Design a protein with these regions (language model features):
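Conserved beta-strand elements of the Class I
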Residues: 3-5, 68
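SAM cofactor-binding core of SAM-dependent methyltransferases
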Residues: 5-58
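Class I S-adenosyl-L-methionine
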Residues: 59-69, 79-251
Length: 335
């Protein structure tokens, strides 16, 4: 039985991928997540007998039970291309988010029994940040802590979900259990399109844009295009893939679809105007969950606003599962 801790847990996407790969051979013994709404979604789906810890900077390593695997999707905002690019200097609401990686390392190394594996996920821009120095610092810190790290950028669309989402994945093995070489998973070759993950009709009319709002979006796009900016909404082909879903501004509008199927006619839209004649709508939270590879039995218990943020911040579960299967092979061989 392998024991795991889930840091920066979000709604549990990384844990879910490892649970799927390891089956009954893994047990999560500690969870940390700062955001309270995310904690609620996590607790709904993982009914652990212990409380979720909050601010990781306040966690003492000695208070964390022994574990074999550390899962850490440390906040990507500090390294995001769309963000401020401040990296380790980023200070958000008084907390240096970029340095939270070092809290992961602190919890893993300030203990007698250090974990066998540290697994991290971050934005694809990490290797480019600060001319490569940010990633160099992360890898160097892992090496100094007696770990052998490997990293690779993988795209979610290569692992059975219709989302063009590139992320960097770092796998670091403790030296005494490290293989001579670690192979990241290859694309599975299964093509899925947006049409495959749509919810059954009828779709609530609240997801359909009003004609007034679409006109506003068009004017915004024209204004930004005239300035040479790339701002704007995007309508995705149902036979294609979505762009990377994100939690920031315009995240939903960059993945609009045309859905001519029946929709409920309840007048629930809060935007002035009538439902647009082109049947353009936002994707639903459940469809976003499917874009990330969450199974339909994964509960989405909160309001849409929270769910879009949580799913945009989460990970693509099938990618995590594929990497976790490779990690399990190494650990099983070293037993």
């Amino acid at each position: 039985m392998y024991k795991a801790i889930d840091l920066f847990a979000g709604i549990g996407g990384i844990r879910l991928g490892f649970d799927q790969a390891f089956g009954d051979q893994i047990k999560t013994v500690f969870v940390s997540e700062f955001d309270e709404p995310a904690q609620k979604t996590y607790r709904t789906n993982f009914r652990d007998p212990f409380e979720i810890a909050g601010d990781i900077t306040q966690i003492n390593a000695c208070d964390v039970p022994d574990f074999d695997i550390a899962l850490a999707g440390f906040p990507c905002q500090a390294f995001s291309i769309a963000g401020s690019k401040k990296g380790f200097a980023d200070d958000f609401k008084g907390r240096a988010r970029g340095t939270l990686f070092f809290d992961t390392l602190r919890i893993c190394t300030e203990r007698e029994n250090k974990p066998k594996v540290i697994f991290c996920e971050n934005v694809k821009g990490l290797p480019m940040h600060d001319r490569g120095r940010t990633l160099e610092v992360i890898l160097g810190a892992l090496k100094e802590a007696n770990y052998v790290p490997w990293w690779q950028i993988l795209n979610s669309k290569d692992f059975g979900v219709p989302q063009n989402r590139e992320r960097i994945y770092i796998v670091a093995f403790r030296k005494d259990v490290a293989p001579e070489h670690f192979s990241f998973p290859s694309p599975i070759g299964k093509e899925v399109c947006l049409r495959d993950i749509l919810e059954d009709a009828p779709i609530s009319s609240k997801y359909y844009l009003s004609d007034t709002y679409i006109e506003t979006l068009r004017k915004h796009r024209e204004r930004h295009q005239s300035k040479g900016n790339g701002f704007g909404y995007q309508i995705r082909s149902l036979d294609g893939t979505a762009g990377a879903i994100v939690c920031g501004g315009m995240g939903r509008e960059r993945n609009l679809i045309v859905d001519h199927r029946e929709h409920s006619m309840k007048p629930v839209t809060r935007i002035k105007g009538k439902i647009n004649d082109e049947d353009i709508r936002k994707m639903t939270p459940r469809e976003w969950a499917r874009l990330q590879g969450f199974p339909d039995n994964f509960e989405l218990p909160l309001a849409d606003t929270h769910l879009y943020k949580q799913l945009g911040n989460s990970v693509s579960v099938p990618v995590i599962r594929a990497i976790a299967e490779q990690i399990k092979e190494v650990l099983d061989d070293k037993r």
